[in-house]
Swiss-Prot record:
Family recorded in the similarity comment: Belongs to the importin beta family.
Pfam families: Importin_rep, Importin_rep_2, Importin_rep_3, TPR_TNPO3_IPO13_2nd, TPR_TNPO3_IPO13_3rd, TPR_TNPO3_IPO13_4th, Xpo1
HEAT repeats mapped onto the chain: 19-49, 51-83, 90-130, 137-174, 189-226, 231-263, 271-320, 325-367, 370-433, 435-471, 482-517, 519-553, 557-595, 598-643, 671-711, 715-749, 756-798, 810-840, 855-888, 892-926
Protein name per UniProt: Importin-13
Ranges of residues in domain Importin N-terminal: 40-106
Protein function: Functions in nuclear protein import as nuclear transport receptor. Serves as receptor for nuclear localization signals (NLS) in cargo substrates. Is thought to mediate docking of the importin/substrate complex to the nuclear pore complex (NPC) through binding to nucleoporin and the complex is subsequently translocated through the pore by an energy requiring, Ran-dependent mechanism. At the nucleoplasmic side of the NPC, Ran binds to the importin, the importin/substrate complex dissociates and importin is re-exported from the nucleus to the cytoplasm where GTP hydrolysis releases Ran.
Disulphide bond pairs: none
Subcellular localization: Cytoplasm; Nucleus
Source organism phylogeny: Eukaryota, Metazoa, Chordata, Craniata, Vertebrata
Organism: Gallus gallus
InterPro entries in UniProt: ARM-like (IPR011989), ARM-type_fold (IPR016024), Exportin-1/Importin-b-like (IPR013598), Importin_beta-like_NTR (IPR051345), Importin_rep_1 (IPR040709), Importin_rep_2 (IPR040944), Importin_rep_3 (IPR040520)
One Gene Ontology term from the biological process aspect of the record: protein import into nucleus
Main location (coarse class): cytoplasm
Keywords: Cytoplasm, Nucleus, Protein transport, Repeat, Transport
Length: 958
């Protein structure tokens, strides 16, 4: 069709005529100018709710109009009905209903999208009229379309009726009817199924019904069952859907219908009907086997969905039918077949993953019975779960190396996730099978490794180890009598493959807590781990395992420390591992060194970090460029990760079992502090060249921040130097990481008299520099503002005396906080709210704070109400509520005046709230000085009113 020339935007005052609506629609669809499109859309929305909408809608549906115009025509019918939240005039219902029936009949053989749109409009109207104005809506629809009409083909009318009946429940599910009306309408619709289901049954059973009609019937049934219709009323159609599974054209739609029908939560009430469904499900087994043999993944997938839907949703109800235990066990075995379906997931099959949650559900239901009944079910189902373990471990096996080499990276990732799901299932199954499961795995592994006549594949060995690892990672195996044997077997494994080696490493890591209780066995596995460190393909598994061993067994590692450090140094120097693994390795070494004597720690630290210090000295002399920047960040990262875990005071110890092994607290300076003091000047030199680079500054701050967190009071000797350096850094180029480190220092040391002077000086300097930044315009630095607000809150919490300093401009800080409340970044606003909730309670005890709040509190209230009125994200309302609560609690006499004055402004905080609503909110806030939760509820309620969202479905869960 030829496009018309670009039309100008329709003026806002233009009459709502057919011609003007057509022009606006043409502009909306074809105008390349986005502003014109937006204007057209805005005008069309006004047209939809205008009185003339009823008139032009029908004219736009003329057959000579293009589909885009016809498609938009029914819009006023849906936008004006109560089902979507507004109202229509009762005297227009009959006319509207009649017109919609007429046009649906006309379009029955025409454009599918226009027909669907008209059906949605009639469905929306029906929902708004039920039950009072149109009590038998569905029966009337069926009757109207079954009436003879010589102008319209019978099949076309049938399809139109089925489309209407399909969209009606769908429209109900998405409607914004009030909750009480929704219940009413659902009940009416459920009763109306008596007019629908016989028709659907008749169409499915007719021999001459074409496939496309039957498919539409199944879709319609699938839509209706989601209205919580009693399962026994669906019985005939479910059986018909089972029959349709034999027709390849209807298979997918029939699966959807059966699954939707038996998955309804209410279905478990109809146990007799559920029992009747087991035979037809079991009857699908031959079709399932044929599909598996022929590689028909779609059919096997669909049949599995049906079996799992019945088993998973109703296992408790079916288990309760003791006299039918054999039929349910047959269903369980059918699902077991689906779990163990031949082929490798996801390349040869995608079905087995559907079944995993069923095994969780069945186990939960069995274990929820009282002990006597549970014992009976355990007797039946324990063998099933042992079989499940074998099936899962078989499914977890890697394919041959050759086959795996052809897999795409996406397929490998899906297989990895699938194995994680299997691992989670095995961990869960342990609750049912207990120690016997570990014994079974150990026996199988032992036979596998000692059978010289029949050498096993590495895949089989790896899968059994993977089963062990899955359980040992989350279950306390310290009292298992098979773990010593397993530790003894591990060195006998012939590792010829990366996947197997990875699993060996992860299994050792999973047993690290057991090794801590049985240190004599460490030497059995540690050499394997150290050897694996040198293999880049085993990077993640070997490094994470060494880290676990060093963390859990550190008090038993001194005899091996020299070897561990030497091997680690070697792989670090060779740059075998990626950055993140290098960081983990340094953390491992930190744990290891923590258990040594101070002299030993210093000696090892010297040999470990000297090469990096030398490299850093060299880099500090070079002209800054991207490559040496990465090297600097890497070295600083290594140091900060080492210092994160190197803790001779044992702050990180929380295991009772290690209490007896703890070394006495060391006297003298902490080794980390010794090293930091030695490299301090070098770090300052690096900073001098890289001060304008946020990443380098962040890396420097990270060294000290992690050290402070780990060492706590032991860091004290460094405080004066660090405060001075931070002051120089922040004065030159303000950065958030420097404020964050300042906050840490305030948190740990500000309350100690000896350290108060340098921290006070640093706090005042950071405050002064940041205030200057605010004067210049802080909008480009939300991260700095965020960190600064957190620093102020921390200072008020830990050392409020800082706000008594004569050269601290409390008024300026207050106004910075108010300005920060208006930032678009939610974390910044949250931090600002945190500042005020700490500041306001100090009004009475800190005179400068009290004076500033009393003189400027109205500005704060104004900003808070603006946020509540719609300027801030709804997710922040709890934080604004806390400020209002604090104002009311600590400045009540002022707040009562401020809130009255603020609310008297027209349109404030929103034009959507009336003076009465504002007055109610004000009084509610002023009355509540005890219950903070109640204030939060008030604020949430008021913000919805301000945004025009109150009472809508959109905010039902808010």
């Amino acid at each position: 069709m030829e496009r018309r020339a670009e039309a100008p935007p329709p003026p806002q005052g233009l009459d709502f005529t057919v011609e003007n609506v057509e022009k606006a629609l043409h502009q909306l669809y074809y105008d390349p100018n986005i502003e014109n499109k937006n204007l057209a859309q805005k005008w069309l929305m006004q047209a939809q709710v205008s009185p003339q909408a009823w008139h032009f809608s029908w004219l736009l549906l003329n057959m000579d109009k293009v589909p885009e115009i016809q498609y938009s025509a029914p819009a006023p019918c849906t936008s004006r009905s109560p089902a979507t939240g507004t109202t229509s005039l009762p005297d227009q219902y009959e006319s509207l209903k009649s017109q919609l029936f007429t046009h649906i009949t006309r379009f029955a053989g025409g454009s599918k999208i226009v027909l669907t749109r008209l059906c949605v409009a009639l469905a929306s109207l029906a929902l708004s009229m039920m039950p009072e104005a149109w009590p038998c809506a569905v029966a009337d629809m069926v009757r109207m379309f079954q009436a003879e009409d010589s102008n319209v083909d019978g099949r076309a009318r049938c399809l139109a009726l089925l489309e209407l009946l399909t969209v009606l429940p769908e429209e109900f599910q998405t409607s914004r009817l009030p909750q009480y009306r929704k219940g009413q309408v659902r009940s009416v619709l459920a009763q109306e199924c008596g007019s629908v289901f016989p028709l659907l049954e008749q169409l499915l059973q007719q021999q001459d019904s074409p496939g496309f009609i039957k498919q539409k019937v199944l879709k319609c049934f699938s839509s209706w069952v989601q209205l919580e219709i009693p399962l026994m009323d669906c019985e005939n159609l479910i059986q018909a859907a089972f029959t349709s599974l034999q027709d390849p054209e209807l298979f997918d739609t029939a699966v959807e219908a059966v699954v939707n029908a038996i998955s309804q939560p209410d279905a478990q009430r109809y146990v007799n009907t559920l029992l009747k469904l087991i035979p037809p499900v079991l009857g699908l087994q031959e079709q399932l086997r044929q599909a598996v043999q022929s590689g028909d993944m779609e059919t096997s997938h669909g049949i599995c969905r049906i079996a799992v839907a019945l088993g998973e949703n109703h296992s408790r109800a079916l288990l309760d039918q003791v006299e039918h235990w054999q039929s349910f066990l047959a269903l369980v075995n059918m699902i077991m077949f689906c779990t163990g379906i031949p082929g490798h997931y996801p390349v040869n099959e995608t079905t087995s993953s559907l079944t995993l949650t069923f095994w969780y559900t069945l186990q939960d239901d069995i274990l929820s019975f009282e002990p006597d009944k549970q014992a009976v079910y355990q007797q039946v189902y324990r063998p099933v779960y042992f079989q499940l373990v074998d099936v899962l471990l078989h499914k977890a096996q890697f394919p041959s190396d050759e086959e795996y080499g052809f897999w795409s990276s996406d397929e490998k990732e899906q297989f990895r996730i699938y194995r994680v799901d299997i691992s989670d299932t095995l961990m869960y199954v342990y609750e049912m099978l207990g120690a016997e499961l570990l014994s079974s795995l150990y026996d199988k592994l032992g036979r596998l490794l000692t059978n010289t006549e029949q050498p096993s594949t590495w895949q089989h060995t790896e899968a059994l180890l993977y089963g062990f690892q899955s359980i040992a990672e989350t279950i306390d195996v310290n009292y298992s009598d098979v773990v010593p044997g397993l530790i003894g077997l591990i060195p006998r494994i012939s590792i010829s493959n990366v996947q197997l080696a990875d699993t060996v490493m992860f299994t050792i890591g999973a047993l690290s807590e057991w090794l801590a209780d049985h240190p004599v066995m460490i030497n059995n596995v540690l050499p394997l781990v150290l050897q694996a460190l040198g293999n880049p393909e085993l990077s993640i598994s070997s490094v994470s395992t060494l880290k676990k061993i060093c963390r859990e067994c550190k008090y038993d590692l001194p005899p091996y420390a020299a070897n561990i450090v030497a091997v680690s140094q070697e792989v670090l120097m060779k740059q075998i591992h990626k950055t993140s693994q290098c960081m983990w390795l340094m953390q491992a070494l930190g744990f290891l060194l923590s258990a040594l004597q101070v002299e030993e720690i210093l000696k090892n630290l010297h040999s470990l970090i000297t090469p990096y210090i030398q490299q850093l000295e060299k880099l500090a002399d070079e002209t800054p460029n991207p490559s040496n920047k990465l090297a600097i960040i890497h070295i600083l990262g290594l140091l900060s990760n080492l210092f994160t875990t190197l803790d001779i005071s044992h702050h990180d110890d929380d295991h009772e079992s290690t209490e007896v092994k703890k070394l006495p607290v060391q006297q003298g300076p902490n080794p980390v502090v010794v090293v930091l003091q030695q490299v301090f000047q070098l770090i300052q030199k690096v900073l001098s060249k890289w001060l304008n680079d946020a990443q380098v500054v962040e890396s420097v701050c990270a060294i000290f921040e992690k050290s402070v967190k780990t060492l706590l009071d032991d860091f004290a000797p460094m405080v004066p130097q660090l405060c001075e350096m931070l002051g120089q850094m922040y004065s030159t180029i303000p950065q958030a990481s420097a404020i964050d480190l300042t906050r840490q220092l305030v948190h740990i040391f500000a309350h100690e008299p000896a350290h108060f002077p340098p921290i006070k000086a640093l706090f005042l300097l950071v405050t002064s520099v940041t205030l200057t930044l605010f004067q210049q315009g802080p909008r480009d630095h939300p991260d700095i503002v965020d960190s600064f607000m957190q620093l102020l809150a921390q200072a008020l919490k830990r050392k409020p005396d800082l706000f008594l300093c004569s050269n601290l401009d409390v008024k300026a800080l207050f106004h910075c906080g108010v300005l920060s409340l208006k930032f678009p970044e939610a974390p910044t606003v949250k931090a600002s709210c945190g500042f005020f909730t700490e500041l306001l309670p100090r009004c009475g005890e800190i005179a400068p704070v009290g004076q500033v709040v009393h003189e400027n509190g109205k500005v704060l209230l104004q900003a808070v109400l603006e946020g509540v009125g719609g300027q801030a994200s709804r997710s922040l309302m709890d934080h604004f509520a806390e400020i209002l609560f604090a104002l009311n609690k600590h400045c009540f006499s002022y707040l009562s005046i401020w809130i009255k004055e603020a609310m008297q402004q027209d349109g404030f905080p929103s034009a959507r709230v009336s003076p009465e609503q504002k007055e109610t909110f004000s009084q509610q806030i002023l009355r509540e000085r005890v219950n903070k939760r109640r204030v939060k509820e008030m604020v949430k309620e008021f913000t919805l009113l301000c945004r025009g969202l109150h009472g809508t479905e959109y905010t039902a869960d808010y």
